[in-house]
C-alpha cells in the first residue's frame, strides 16, 4: 500500500487557517457522501455542504485521488473502496459489536423484525450493527455506520435519558442543538415533551419511538449497561411496521425482550 505524506502538498506561505478550512471542507464532503449509499449528484452535495461548486470540485477530486470517493455514472459521487476498507477495519475492532451481534440475531429471529445496536455521538445515534430477518424485516433508511438525530429515535432516547437526567438538562440541550429536526408530525421537538419521554425511559427501562423518525415505523429500545452500571454503552432496538406491530403490541413485547437481552448478555438492562 502506498502512503502519501499529507505535508507534501502544503502550499508555501498558505495561512494555517486556510489549510484547516480546506481540510474541514473535505471532511464535510466525505461525511455527506456517507448519507447517500447509492450515490449523489453535485447539486445535492453543494446544498448539503453549503460550499461553492469550485471548492466542492477540489474536495471531490482530492477524495477521488485518495480512493475515498468514486465518480460514477451520470456524474454522481459515492464513497470509495479506501473508505470502506478503513471503515471495516474500525468496525472489526469493536469488541462491543461482537458482544451484541448474537443478541441482534436472537431478537430478529424471535420477533421477525429488524434489530439494531447504536451508540450516542453528540446529538446523533450511530448504527454499529443491524440484523434484518430474511423476507420479513422492515425496510428502513438505517445503515451500519449511518446516523439519525437522537431525539427522534428509540435508540437515541434510551441513551439520552441518562445523559440528560432532568428537565433543566433537556432544556439546555434543546437550546444548544435546537431547533430539533421534525422528521414526522410525531417527533418530539419541544423540551417539555422530550423531557417527559426521557423520564419514561428512566421509569420503565426502555424507550418507544411512535413513528417519530420514519412514518409507519415504530420501535422499542433498551439501553445496555455493558461497561458501567450507571452510564449506558449503547442501546438495542426492535423496529417494525405499524400495521404489523402497533405501538401497543411492540410495548407488550418489552418483558420478553428484556428477558432475551438478559439471557444473552446478562443483567445489562435496568
Task: List the predicted regions and their residue ranges.
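Extended hydrophobic
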Residues: 184-262
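N-terminal helix-turn-helix
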Residues: 1-97, 262-267
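Cysteine/selenocysteine-centered motifs that mediate thiol-based redox chemistry or coordinate metal-sulfur cofactors
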Residues: 177-179, 261-270
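Amphipathic coiled-coil signal-relay and dimerization helices
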Residues: 125-131, 137-141
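Short, solvent-exposed recognition segments
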Residues: 9, 137-215
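Short regulatory alpha-helical segment in sensory/regulatory domains of signaling proteins that mediates
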Residues: 104-112, 116
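Conserved hydrophobic/aromatic positions in well-ordered beta-strands
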Residues: 116-118, 126-129, 220-222
